[in-house]
Design a protein with these regions (language model features):
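Substrate-binding/active-site clefts of carbohydrate-active enzymes
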Residues: 1-74, 79-105, 125, 170
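Acidic, His- and aromatic-enriched active-site or binding-groove loops in soluble protein domains
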Residues: 21-35, 135-149, 279-284
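Active-site rim elements
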Residues: 52-55, 86-90, 172-173, 228-240, ...
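Alpha-helical packing segments of well-folded alpha/beta enzyme cores
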Residues: 58-69, 99, 238-249, 253, ...
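Conserved alpha/beta catalytic core and glycan-binding cleft of carbohydrate-active enzymes
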Residues: 74, 95-260, 264-265, 273-277, ...
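Extended hydrophobic/aromatic segments used for targeting, binding, or gating
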Residues: 268-302
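Catalytic cores of secreted or luminal carbohydrate-active enzymes
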Residues: 292-327
Length: 328
């Protein structure tokens, strides 16, 4: 069990928001405030506030929480939302941040799986490949490269090969292994895999923000028509593209992360920001498995997973190393 934890902000929002968590206890200790205008919050998270990880109280809160989940609830590890925010000592992301030291020195937390979402929206917030050796990372470069390759984007072949073989350019220099790369194509944010091959544009009208919310550049390709279609050739092409993505993901070096429902074709009708939708749009519809095409896609996914599990060549412990061929 990997627990998704969000220690980078609270529900207060910006300075105009309600007092829900720590604002009424010690605003300056728990939140990053704008220097010289302490009524305002620094916002590295896109939520209106950022937790003050420079203060001992905030750090103690985080570490106590992590230890509790390991010792009492027996989780196997954590995925840290917007983890770059937790490493901001002054303004920049600091590889020597106190948070990293505390995690690495902790006899309990350091022994479980630690997975970073290695970015935030602040200055220089994209930190893929820069986390300490005991961490694994969501590999955003893998996602972007694989999406570009399968939509026919030129000049991606070389980088595609790097991502397929574990992204040694990102992780080998500090003695990390291929498993440090959490390979993914889709996640809870963004398109589902089926929507990735069915829509060129987001369709978030149901969110009530006039389709302004959510990522606009999705590196998607609808295979010829936007959204649902009765064209059998386009539907076949879309299913083939899904199989291309699944095979690439599950046979790449590194740790594959498959978003739930992608294995049988779950759709969000082109909505790539369903955090606010507690309805059929975001729910899992298990009855889809009664459909022939969905059951076939699940069967395909199982077969590819079986190939990965039965052949260690797809689960190397070390990066590939090139060398000259023998003359004989």
């Amino acid at each position: 069990v990997i627990l998704d934890v969000v220690y980078n902000h609270t529900a207060e929002g910006n300075h105009m928001g309600p007092t829900i968590a720590f604002r009424g206890i010690d605003n300056g200790a728990y939140y990053r405030l704008v220097e010289g205008d302490e009524a305002q919050y620094m916002d590295y998270t896109g939520t209106g506030n950022s937790l003050n990880v420079r203060h001992p109280h905030s750090l103690q809160l985080i570490m106590d929480s992590l230890r509790y989940w390991v010792t009492e609830m027996r989780v196997d590890g954590f995925r840290f939302d917007l983890a770059a925010t937790l490493a901001r000592e002054l303004d920049d992301v600091d590889k020597l941040a106190t948070f990293f030291d505390l995690v690495q020195q902790d006899p309990i937390v350091s022994q479980v799986k630690l997975i970073a979402e290695p970015w935030d929206i602040g200055h220089d917030g994209y930190q893929v490949g820069n986390f300490p050796p005991i961490w694994s990372e969501w590999n955003g470069k893998y996602r972007d490269t694989v999406r570009d390759f399968w939509r026919g984007e030129p000049a991606t072949l070389g980088e595609f090969a790097s991502r397929l073989t574990g992204s040694s350019d990102l992780y080998a220099d500090n003695d990390r292994r291929p498993t440090a790369s959490i390979n993914f194509i889709t996640a809870h944010d963004g398109f589902t895999l089926r929507d990735l091959v069915s829509y060129n544009d987001k369709h978030n009208e149901a969110n009530g923000e006039d389709n302004r919310d959510g990522e606009s550049f999705n590196r998607s390709w609808n295979c010829g028509e936007e959204g649902p279609t009765d064209n059998d050739e386009i539907r076949k092409l879309r299913r083939r593209q899904v199989r291309n993505f699944l095979t690439t993901l599950l046979l790449s070096q590194g740790t594959p992360m498959l978003s739930h429902g992608d294995e049988f074709g779950r759709t969000q009708d082109g909505n790539n920001n369903v955090y606010c939708q507690d309805n059929e749009l975001s729910w899992m519809d298990w009855s889809m498995l009664e459909e022939e095409k969905s059951a076939a896609m699940l069967g395909f996914t199982k077969r590819v997973l079986s190939i990965r599990n039965h052949h260690p060549v797809f689960r190397r412990k070390r990066f590939l190393a090139g060398g000259p061929l023998g003359s004989d």
